[in-house]
Every structure is written in C-alpha cells, then in structure tokens.
Amino acid sequence: MEKTYHFTGIKGSGMSALALMLHQMGKNVQGSDSTDYFFTQRGLEQVGVPLLPFDEKNIKPEFELIIGNAFRDDNNVEIAFAHKNGFPFKRYHEFLGHFMEDFTSIGVAGAHGKTSTTGMLAHVMSNIVDTSYLIGDGTGRGNAGSEYFVFESDEYERHFMPYHPEYTIMTNIDFDHPDYFEGIEDVTSAFQDYANNIKKGIFAYGEDVNLRKLSAKAPIYYYGFEANDDYRAENLIRNTRGSSFDAYFRGEKIGHFVVPAYGKHNVLNALSVVAVCHNLGLDMTDVADHLLTFRGVKRRFTEKKVGETVIIDDFAHHPTEIEATLDAARQKYPDREIVAVFQPHTFTRTIAFADEFAEVLDHADTVYLAQIYGSAREVDHHEITAQDLADKVRKPAKVIELDNVSPLLDHDRGVYVFMGAGNIQKYEIAFEKLLSQTSTNLQ
C-alpha cells in the first residue's frame, strides 16, 4: 500500500511547495491547516491535494508525518496527539534534508532575496535540464528522475543545518529574526556552520563583509560589481523595461544577459544564477534566453492595475527589503508618485528596526502604515505601535485601518507598494474594491 504523507501546517510556503513536489512525484499527499485563506493553497487545490482543518483524527500511525516548524504540543492538537501516542514525525527541514540526498542539490540562502533567486534559478535550470525545485512562494515541482534539486535554504532557528547540498548561493548576511538571533555575529556564525556543510561550491555576494569572512572546505566564488569578484557584472543598464549586463568570470566574458526585473538586487540575483549555471557547465546562450522569460515569483513585486492605478504586492518586511522594493518601483515608474503601504511584521522586529524602517520608508513619496502584525510566537507588551513608527517617518505618514482604507484615494496615478509578511493583502484587497467602484478596468 502506498504511503500517505500528512503535512501539519500545509499552507506554509515551504510546506505547500514540498507537498506539491511529492504529489507530482506520484505520492499520496494530504494536509491540515487553519481554515483562513492563504495564497499558497490555490496550487494545492488545483491539483486536488486534500486540505483539512486541524484535528487529531487526521493522524494515523501508518502516515509519514511532516510537521511545520512553528507547531508545538501547546499550540497544535495534531502534534500533541502524535507525541502522546508515540507516532514518529519529522520537521519540515529535517524531511527536506533527507529528501535532497537523491539529487545534485543547490540551496539558496541569505537574509534577503532567497525566494526571488530560488525562483529565477529554478526557472532557468528547469528549462535547460531536468530540475525539481522548492520555492518559498509555495511553488514546487517534483520528478524522481531529476538530476538537480533547487531549494530555498532558511537560516531562521538554523533550519538549514540538516542540509548538505552540493552547491549553495548566499545572497547576503543581515541581522533579522531578533526573536532568535542575538545579533549579526550570531547570524554570521550560523552561515559559517552552513558553509561547512556544502560539498562542491559556494556562490556568495562579494560586497557583503560578513560573507567575505566565511571559510569552507568547498571553494567560494564571489559575485558582484567589484574587480575582486570571481563573477562580475559590467556595463549595467537599468531602465523602465528591466536591466541588462555583461557577465565576466575572472576577466573572461561569458555572456550578455537581460532580466525583465527591477532593482539592483535583481541584477545580483541574476548574476548569482549565471554563476551557478556557468559552474555547472550549462550553455550560457540557453541561460540568457531563459533569464529573459523569467516573470518573477509570488508576492515579490507582483503588479496589477486598476484603471491608471498601479498596485504592487511584495513580501518585504525588513528595512533592506523595503529599500530594494522601493528602488525597483522607482526604476520602473520614475515619473510617478510612489506610495508605500507597509505593515510591520512582529513586535520584536519593529522594536529592533524602528529607526531603520523609518529611514527606508522615506524613500517613498508618501507612507501609510497598517497595524503591526504580531506572530503566534510573541505577546504584545505595548512597547511600540504603528503610530510610533509613523512619527519617526519624515515623509507624510498616516496609520490606516482595514475597515477604512479611503485615505489611500488621495493620490492621482499613484504607484501603491503594499509590503509586509502578515495580512497586508487584506488591505490591498480592500483598496482594490474601493478603486473598482470607480473603475471596472481591472487587469
């Protein structure tokens, strides 16, 4: 009898992608989660993966249990039931560590840019060679016969430590997750431990001072814009259609590349993809062709229009990510008003980075803040509010409520950049409904 894989917390971005992969490999897959809608569930529903509410009755001794990393006995009935009855289970990252052993695996790690870079690498490679992949936007593709496996490698709580891939990209090291990491030294230590796991090659952003500190058994190839980088981008052109550059490996030109994406960070993402593919011996003409057709990943600078109004949805929830997203918006829409609509994610992060949030939000023309979205792991001690953050922003800044987003209407031909990792999409939907009352041209 074919084994059934049960995912507790299947709507999580990594969990849903892994479930899709196993389903495509012909496995029996089901999962449970909150009944609230989350954008990752659409792909699961389209292929017929059963989605159940949390219930101890979902757990059977013969099932292979895969548990989301956020769940414990005290917050989930299924894991409590499994523990009580002695049923074995694996955490998401533990299962993934075993899964990748059957492939030549390529991880993408970094405080920022993991999902976009994983998506770009997966798109390019899967169009050239049989490649399975797991992307942090909930997208996954699985084929047991694939030669390569591309996946997102998360540093939070050192979840990437069970991973021993052949290769990895490291986009950057930055202090995030202040509820877990003590500071930048702690984060750097985690990346050093992960670097020791890599078997054949590390591709790291050369202008990151902490990545330059790493040592490893595998060779480290640095990429960037500087003369001391192994892989270097030159002749960079950024315009309203995207970005183009020439790529060099240790002084030798390996190709000209165009990426229909915006922001300096996406040029670096593309260069890291070029570096990996070049090292693997893939044809650079093929790589260039498929970079040109990359259309992004979910919730990363995702655009739509309501009449003349542009709405951009992005997962950005750290100052570095907000800065990159607003830079991308300026590149594509240099002559229009940039309106930032940001929901701070977790009280610990908002407290830790309040000044930095205010500084980068000033890159917009106008700023609106939604109420802080607290995580299930923390308690609001009323140490900071959205209004406190608004008071730090120099540009015009207001706090808006979900039941009244009408202040957002005060901008003609605005480019609205909705950013956050909580429920900012609810504000976005409310705004779209408000706009649609005066325009039916929803694209």
UniProtKB/Swiss-Prot annotation:
It is an enzyme of class 6 (ligase). GO terms for molecular function: ATP binding; UDP-N-acetylmuramate-L-alanine ligase activity. It catalyses: UDP-N-acetyl-alpha-D-muramate + L-alanine + ATP = UDP-N-acetyl-alpha-D-muramoyl-L-alanine + ADP + phosphate + H(+). Keywords: ATP-binding, Cell cycle, Cell division, Cell shape, Cell wall biogenesis/degradation, Cytoplasm, Ligase, Nucleotide-binding, Peptidoglycan synthesis. One of its GO terms (cellular component) is cytoplasm. Its EC number is 6.3.2.8. The keyword Cell division applies. Belongs to the MurCDEF family. Cell wall formation. This is UDP-N-acetylmuramate--L-alanine ligase. It comes from Lactococcus lactis subsp. cremoris (strain SK11). The lineage of its organism: Bacteria, Bacillati, Bacillota, Bacilli, Lactobacillales. The gene is murC.
